[in-house]
């Protein structure tokens, strides 16, 4: 299996375990990370830590990669089933943020074996 995909699988595993430090070690110091709740991006490892710490006080997301595809320009797109529950494990109702149950495309750009950029797109599988 591709080493970059192994890195991404570890990131998903550590994210679902709420092991922020386990994820941050796989990111470059200057990472650009999509903010799925509010839009835009956060920049740097500590900003990613703050983003997830805030997110996990409001919702309980779980992300399950079901396929990976490397694009011609070297990015890796993961098709991901995203489920988001409230802190009691119940389905969300009436949320105003962008997180909800759906299948999405996570686009990763790696540099020297670490994630340098992460974006979110609507899932289009197989990728175009």
What role is predicted for each listed range?
Residues 1-29, 128:
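Short, low-complexity N-terminal intrinsically disordered segments enriched in polar/charged residues
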Residues 2-6, 53-128:
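A beta-strand edge to alpha-helix "cap/lid" segment located at domain peripheries
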Residues 5, 21-24, 28-74:
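A solvent-exposed, acidic/Ser-Thr-rich amphipathic alpha-helical stretch
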Residues 19, 33, 120-124:
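Poly-acidic low-complexity segments
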């Amino acid at each position: 299996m591709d080493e970059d995909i192994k890195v991404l699988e570890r990131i998903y595993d550590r994210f679902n375990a709420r092991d922020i430090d386990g994820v941050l070690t796989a990111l470059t110091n200057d990472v650009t990370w999509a903010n799925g709740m509010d839009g835009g991006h956060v920049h740097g490892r500590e900003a990613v830590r703050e983003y997830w710490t805030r997110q996990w006080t409001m919702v309980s997301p779980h992300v399950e990669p079901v396929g990976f595809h490397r694009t011609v320009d070297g990015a890796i797109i993961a098709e991901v089933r995203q489920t988001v529950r409230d802190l009691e494990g119940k389905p969300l109702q009436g949320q105003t943020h962008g997180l909800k149950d759906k299948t999405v495309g996570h686009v990763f750009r790696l540099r020297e074996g670490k994630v340098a950029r992460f974006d979110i797109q609507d899932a289009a599988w197989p990728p175009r």
